[in-house]
């Protein structure tokens, strides 16, 4: 053994003695190189994310215009975690949580931990305490824009508080990121969008709360309404596009198209029908949809209704979609972190 190697081994032993086992290791020896994921609750979004869902122990940012479906997407993730026996928490900084709607999306409201903090500091401290407990699988903060610093709440209405929220978020994320990774908690931050003043060229839209969240996020999702869905003259929902703007665990810029139905959330039948048609698992001839020479219905809405009533057939088609994209259905679905996508 060379003197250099002996010196390195001694240094490694000293580091492990001082900071604990696992504080330093060779990358190839790391037991958890593979990224464990939890389904987003939407098959189309799982495919767009590239690894079959949200990566555990990471920060996710979901942003978009008002009423675009940001909270709906987050509630579906909570419902999926609960379905697998996990614990979920919701920090409702906007004080706008609708338990009836959440229940319709499959959320077990009797088991969901809910906090409606008075200040941004309080909300982030509660989030930190829950994450450090190691007993929470997913935590949603709704929203970053509503995490108002204490100084702003206690000040007068016209007072200027430049950069206060950005400093709050930067400090909180520095403390939270390590704890989130160790506890394997999925932390979803919902964010709004704002317009930059005086931007002549390029995109004038930005998200509040400074730049820290953009850097710390493993995945950033942009949620936007594409068009209205109608039954006759009635508007029953929106076709929504979810774009993966940033992704450290798979290639970014993939887009998931989902139907968000009023009072129901993401239509599983709609996304399965669209994806199966693209892959030719379901054949479309004129207005008719068919699977294995069995007609599902005339028109998209009738075919969606048929799949809703025939769940075994729906899940069989979903299985073939997952198989095509190499996505596992169980919560232990794994993907390898791509080093070329790291900041």
Swiss-Prot record:
Which region is the signal sequence?
none
* A GO CC term attached to the entry: cytosol
Positions that bind ATP: 64-71
In terms of CDD domains, this protein maps to: RecA (cd00983)
Q: Which domain of life is it from?
A: Bacteria
| Keyword Metal-binding attributed | no
User: What keywords sit in the KW lines?
Assistant: ATP-binding, Cytoplasm, DNA damage, DNA recombination, DNA repair, DNA-binding, Nucleotide-binding, SOS response
Record's subcellular location: Cytoplasm
InterPro entries from the xrefs? Answer: AAA+_ATPase, DNA_recomb/repair_RecA, DNA_recomb/repair_RecA_CS, P-loop_NTPase, RecA-like_C, RecA-like_N, RecA_ATP-bd, RecA_C_sf
Q: What Gene Ontology terms for biological process does this UniProt record contain?
A: DNA recombination; DNA repair; SOS response
Q: Which GO terms describe its molecular function?
A: ATP binding; ATP hydrolysis activity; ATP-dependent DNA damage sensor activity; damaged DNA binding; single-stranded DNA binding
What does it do? Answer: Can catalyze the hydrolysis of ATP in the presence of single-stranded DNA, the ATP-dependent uptake of single-stranded DNA by duplex DNA, and the ATP-dependent hybridization of homologous single-stranded DNAs. It interacts with LexA causing its activation and leading to its autocatalytic cleavage.
The UniProt family comment states: Belongs to the RecA family.
HAMAP family on file: RecA
Name the NCBIfam families on file: tigrfam_recA
The record's annotation in PANTHER family points to:
MITOCHONDRIAL DNA REPAIR PROTEIN RECA HOMOLOG-RELATED, RECA
Which protein, by its recorded name, is this? Protein RecA
Mind giving the lineage of the organism this protein is from? Bacteria, Bacillati, Bacillota, Bacilli, Bacillales
């Amino acid at each position: 053994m060379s003197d250099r190697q002996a010196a390195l081994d001694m240094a490694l032993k000293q580091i492990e003695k001082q900071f604990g086992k696992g504080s330093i290791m060779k990358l190839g020896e790391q037991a958890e190189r593979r990224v464990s994921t939890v389904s987003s609750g939407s098959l189309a979004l799982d495919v767009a994310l590239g690894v079959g869902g949200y990566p555990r122990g990471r920060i996710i940012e979901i942003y978009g215009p008002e009423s675009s479906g940001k909270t709906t997407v987050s509630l579906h993730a909570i419902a999926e975690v609960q379905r697998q026996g996990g614990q979920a928490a919701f920090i409702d900084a906007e004080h706008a949580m609708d338990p009836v709607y959440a229940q319709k999306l499959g959320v077990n409201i009797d088991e969901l931990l809910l906090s409606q903090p008075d200040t941004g500091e309080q909300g982030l401290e509660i989030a930190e305490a829950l994450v450090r407990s190691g007993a929470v699988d997913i935590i949603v903060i709704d929203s970053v824009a509503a995490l108002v610093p204490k100084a702003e709440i206690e000040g007068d209405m016209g007072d200027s508080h430049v950069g206060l929220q950005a400093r709050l978020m930067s400090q909180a994320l520095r403390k939270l990121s390590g704890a989130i990774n160790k506890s394997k908690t999925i932390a979803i931050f919902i964010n709004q969008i704002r317009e930059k003043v005086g931007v002549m060229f390029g995109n004038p839209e930005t998200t509040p709360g400074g730049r820290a969240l953009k850097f710390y996020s493993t995945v950033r999702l942009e949620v936007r309404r594409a068009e209205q869905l109608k039954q006759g003259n009635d508007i029953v929902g929106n076709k929504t596009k979810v774009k993966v703007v940033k992704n450290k665990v798979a290639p970014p810029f993939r887009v998931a198209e989902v139907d968000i139905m009023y009072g129901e959330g993401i239509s599983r039948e709609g996304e399965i029908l669209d994806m199966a048609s693209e892959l030719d698992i379901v054949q479309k001839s004129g207005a008719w949809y068919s699977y294995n020479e069995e007609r599902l219905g005339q028109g998209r809405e009738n075919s969606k209704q048929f799949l809703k009533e025939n769940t075994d057939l729906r899940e069989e088609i979903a299985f073939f979609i997952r198989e095509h994209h190499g996505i596992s259905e169980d919560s232990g679905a794994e993907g390898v972190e791509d080093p070329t996508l790291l900041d």
